[in-house]
């Protein structure tokens, strides 16, 4: 899959959600990424929080434990990033 996005045009929220999807579903393919996106959406709905708040809540998604957005942005360069970004939007 060709990379069609440019990181400069992505919002902080989109990056955080896509990175969460990519990191938590690593190796699981599109079904796994879809499942992580569904968990984020469901938690946001149930807890009346933004998806970003859900992703960054301590110990909810292990990829963020002790990590920053800058330290994980490299994930947006993997081939699966386009699908994760589409789900994040």
Write out the residue ranges for each language-model feature:
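Bacterial extracytoplasmic/cell-wall-associated proteins, especially those involved in peptidoglycan
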Residues: 2-89
């Amino acid at each position: 899959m060709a990379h069609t996005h440019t990181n400069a045009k992505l919002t902080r929220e989109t990056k955080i959600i896509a990175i969460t999807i990519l990191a938590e579903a690593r190796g699981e393919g599109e079904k796994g990424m879809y499942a992580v996106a569904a968990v984020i959406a469901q938690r946001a709905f149930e807890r009346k929080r933004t998806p970003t708040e859900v992703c960054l809540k301590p110990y909810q998604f292990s990829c963020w434990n002790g990590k920053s957005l800058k330290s994980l942005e490299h994930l947006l360069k993997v081939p699966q990033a386009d699908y994760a970004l589409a789900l994040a939007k």
